[in-house]
Amino acid sequence: MSVLKEFKEFAVKGNVIDLAVGVVIGGAFGSIVKSLVDDVIMPPIGLLIGNVDFSNLFFVLKDGAKQAGPYVSVAAAKQAGATTLNLGLFINALVSFTIVAFAIFMLVKAINRLKREEAAPAPAAPATKECRYCLSAIPEKATRCPCCTSQLD
């Protein structure tokens, strides 16, 4: 079998296509969550804390060789060659990760619940026999009929 044909069989399998779709949707979901955190959630939190812009919350560890601080933004510090600890960007990434992890947890939890419902076997019908005197259905191991009280063999 040629390498091209083997690759085609591998690529067309359902699992590979599902994985590719998952990666694309995951990337899109990640960018939506990043925008949600950066543009919707963190600005009000920064306002409540005291007019803090988390995207520009940083500490200068070492001034830049091109220009000494203070720097108005992370971009200005990086342009000057300063070494910075970007705490605000880390907080934004942490909030984004928490939202994505919680969404994935809820999705997996729902899928597992559906799998358990599918996998639950139907309860087996009780083994019964017919009473030869009154013809009612009685348990297989019964020695006396509960309906007519006849002694069974």
Swiss-Prot record:
Organism field: Chromobacterium violaceum (strain ATCC 12472 / DSM 30191 / JCM 1249 / CCUG 213 / NBRC 12614 / NCIMB 9131 / NCTC 9757 / MK)
TM stretches of this protein: 16-36, 88-108
High-level lineage: Bacteria, Pseudomonadati, Pseudomonadota, Betaproteobacteria, Neisseriales
Subunit-level organization: Homopentamer.
Molecular function (Gene Ontology), one example: mechanosensitive monoatomic ion channel activity
Family (UniProt): Belongs to the MscL family.
Organism superkingdom: Bacteria
Full protein name: Large-conductance mechanosensitive channel
Function summary: Channel that opens in response to stretch forces in the membrane lipid bilayer. May participate in the regulation of osmotic pressure changes within the cell.
Keyword Ribosomal protein: no
Stored InterPro entries: Mechanosensitive_channel_CS, MS_channel, MSC/AndL, MscL_channel
UniProt KW keywords: Cell inner membrane, Cell membrane, Ion channel, Ion transport, Membrane, Transmembrane, Transmembrane helix, Transport
Gene name, Swiss-Prot/TrEMBL: mscL
